[in-house]
From Swiss-Prot:
Highest classification ranks of the organism: Eukaryota, Metazoa, Ecdysozoa, Nematoda, Chromadorea
Subcellular location: Mitochondrion outer membrane
Keyword Transmembrane helix: yes
Pfam families referenced in this protein's UniProt entry, alphabetically: Dynamin_N, Fzo_mitofusin
Protein name: Transmembrane GTPase fzo-1
Region called G1 motif, residue ranges: 107-114
GO molecular function: GTP binding; GTPase activity
Major subcellular site: mitochondrion
Mitochondrial intermembrane side: 639-640
Amino acid sequence: MSGTASLVHTLPASGDSNHRGLHSLKNSRRAADNEPLLRFREAKKVLGDVYGELKDNVAELEGVYKDIKENDFVSSEQREEIEAIGDSIKTIMDTFQRDNMKVVFFGRTSNGKSTTINAMLHEKVLPQGMGHTTCCFLQVEGSEGEVGHLQLDDNPQKIDMKMLGKIGHALSDENSDLPAMGQDSLLKVFHPKKSESGECRLLQNDVVILDSPGVDLSPEFDSWIDKHCLDADVFVLVSNAESTLTQAEKNFFLRVAKKLSKPNVFILNNRWDASAAETENIEDVKKQHLTRFRQFLVDELEVCSEREVNDRIFFVSSREVLESRLKARGLVQKAYQAEGHGTRALEFQNFERHFEHCISRSAIHTKFEAHNRRAHEMIGKMRLNLNSVLTSAAEQRSKLQNNLNESTRTFNECRVNFTQFEKAYREQTEQLRAEVHLKVSADFFEEIARLDAIIDRFEQPFDGSSSGMTKYKEDLAIFVDKCLSSDLEARCTGGLMSRIWNLENDMFQYVTKILAEPYQNKLEEVWRYRAPFKFSICVDVPALVNDFHEDLEFRFTFGLHAIIRRIIAYRSGQPVTAINTNLLTPLSLKQQSEKNSVRDAEASAASEEQAMMTQMVLTSAAFLANGSLGVLVVGGIVYKAVGWRVIAVGGAAYAGLYAWERMRWNSGAKEQHLKEQFRSHLAARMQQVSTAHTHHCETQAIREMDQVFDGLKATVGGVHREMKNDLDVQKTQIDAVDSTIRTLGTIKGKAVFLLRNLEQFASSYLRSDSPPTP
């Protein structure tokens, strides 16, 4: 071994308490820097003492919480949190003592993994040599007993060490009656930390060494990694200097790199003693190996940098080192040594030195950094829990001691004032309903009067075809609907918004005044996120003009057909545009029935019956009016009554009016006539739905006020319940609070002291330069 690593077998003495052990760190650190393996045991001892004190503090706090009555200022969640912390500490302490430094050796079959392990242990612990092949995982760890033994992973029964060569040897003919060992099974080898041949420094310092089958025996590496490698601190790849790095070896470590974050990997190029026979190309071969190893560690695995990689690759002969160490101890007479063995021995010692520093630093960080962080978290949770309980206790005591009478008076006044507020609210809502009714009704009829101006703003090319006319009416209805809805919303919202807002604000201000100051924030939270009120108005013009039938054929104002349509519209109580324009044609009944096919059967039948009666009357009148006999009869009667001059003048005036209207009938007149018919029809329909519209707006305003009132009432109800509960608690718990506050303050001081110990532990063991790199 390296001369720079002096053997230290015992831990420095420490006191019973954790802080006394921490004070001794300054004296022991200088020795620990020279013996990195010792730092792991020191850190384990110090952190274990911290956890012991933390366990006592949590147990004391649990006892205090149990003495406090249920539903007091310690909630059930806070009790459960402390109990969970206590359970976590027990679990961590159970596993804490089993934490150790673990190194796993991998490589192809017969590359010298077992020989390398024996060389590091200074003793032939594992079977090795020609013809021996490890068939399973062999885990070597220290035993406090004087005699070593074997133990299967799933069986606690001890097995004699003499059976190791048979059980772990894949090629042995004498293990037919022994337990079958699969390649991923584990055989534990418990070797005495102090044996007759001396003390094993690695095993003395809690280093666990894992030997593996050859990676070329099975491509199923995932089960190997999951079972045996996830807790490893260092991986050592034992390669053969007489061959290059194989894909099987690469694949294994690529799998490891995927499952572990940046594993620590060393590469031992074993059997470098073979280079003694080939001195000519030895440097070229070494450079070739170095290049491939660097590329694998830096570029492919990405586990170290270019600067670090030189301390991860070593060219050694494990056989030479083992036999040399056995000879030094007098266990063999002659040691195998080839030319250059001294350089290779120094290289092996250099590997051991870097390995010990690496595994110590890695194990402390991987095993203890998480424990240290977890202890910080648990102490932090305990302190937050304590602070919360102490704050609640102090507030409770202050309220119970000084504000009991004041709280009772405030509670009673709040209840009386809210009852008065509820009565006033009912009166205000009825007044608001009347105001909304007047305002909305007036605005609605004003919009009806403005229909001419709204319709005149509609500009779209007029198409007299059937499809064009349908599209024109649909677009006109949509345009008018948007204008009416937006105008009515603006009128109603603008006129009534200030009134509604002022009323809501008055409600909020009144309720704020009747609540005590500590509870006013609850009301502000409800009020802050409330959206402003706005009327939602939908006139739905397309639905109102659904029965609109335009009449764009030229019809003389004083013609018989026009007069009859006006009479029918008056008698039926409908706009004249709701009367079909083709009443005088027999085909109109069929067309009307097809248009209204979506209506129910009864309405369709009634419409057909009415249309048939109208058809009969109008057809009879038309035949009578158009027949020559009718003309002669009527003409004779009029002639006898008024004379021919009056008839001539009347006929001329009638003909003149007819000619004047006929001359003015063009596309523009048709469009204007259509808009006028549309306006007249829509105005009549809007007057019919004005009452429903007004009621709808009233409902919206009252609903808005009810929502505000319900929110205020729910908030005040919650405040009343809290005030009542506070009064009940204040009457019974003053003395208990005083005693609890004193006890909790003592526990809190202990928690602060433990935090300082953890910070000192992190500074001594977990900082980036601890232990220093060799």
